[in-house]
Amino acid sequence: MKIEIIKKNINFGGIVSDINITEDLNGDIINNLDNKLNELCLLVFKKQKLTDNQQIKFSEYFGKIEGAGNNTTIRSMKERRLSDKFGDVSNLDVNNKPLKKTDNKRFFALGNRLWHTDASFKKIPAKYSLLSGRKVAKIGGETQFVDMRAAYDALSEEKKSIIKNMISYHSLIYSRQKLGLDMKKMISAEEIKNFTPVKQPLVRENKITKRKALFLASHIGKIEGMEKPDAILFVNDLIEHSTQENFLYTHHWDEDDLVIWDNRQSMHRGLYFNDQNEIRDVRRTTTVSYTHLRAHETREDLVCRLLLE
């Protein structure tokens, strides 16, 4: 296995070669990949023709899969193409046809083109996301990633002091409001409860590397102790700072690419493609780490590892 660093100036991202992730992998390889994710935050695997079951198996090497629950989508179970272990970030309906231009599910999915961190709106947010390009757009549809560790490091000491104990509120309602969507008209009052805002720190520290990172997303709608307009502008300024070119990697998709990234240390967004005339079938699995026993790991090993994560 070889890893070529993508952005050497900030030690961000790596292209992994000489590995077939459709096969069984031993504990040493998984631990090496996990260590590289802590170090580089993002790994790209080329030419990995995965089935859904193979993607699930590979994902579970890194933690328990967080299912696509009612607080992640407005698609009902009967409207979903994929199992609930997947986040469907395609432009397709249950019949594998492009969602119509005026479909609320399409409008909701457009929120993925805003800068965000997966599942920051959950009490226990995501650790890793794994995105498999089953069919990709010929033009557009890239995914951009930014290194939130480097963005934090570049802040002034004064700004670091200001934000170190800040608490923000995350909800998909906040990000969709930025698109002009009125969720109260799209779903029922009972369903709205699934999107109750949750608190998150504005700065997180990786317990292994000890590096701090900004924890931002367009899902933020409030900051404790700030008036809402001030909070929105404050977050917008931080996002603008964090998405400078020197912190950014743009992934141009080839079919059968698999990209895995650390949501604790990065932020991302999808770019425009013609979703009425092209199919973009990308399937995401998302992991959390608090209940998973890795291959060749004892329960005592698990407890020790989780104390570090």
Predicted regions and their residues:
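Non-heme Fe(II) oxygenase catalytic core, chiefly the N-lobe of the double-stranded beta-helix
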Residues: 2-258, 263-290
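Hydrophobic alpha-helical segments, chiefly the membrane-spanning helices
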Residues: 302-309
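Conserved small/polar residues in nucleotide/adenosyl-binding loops
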Residues: 291-300
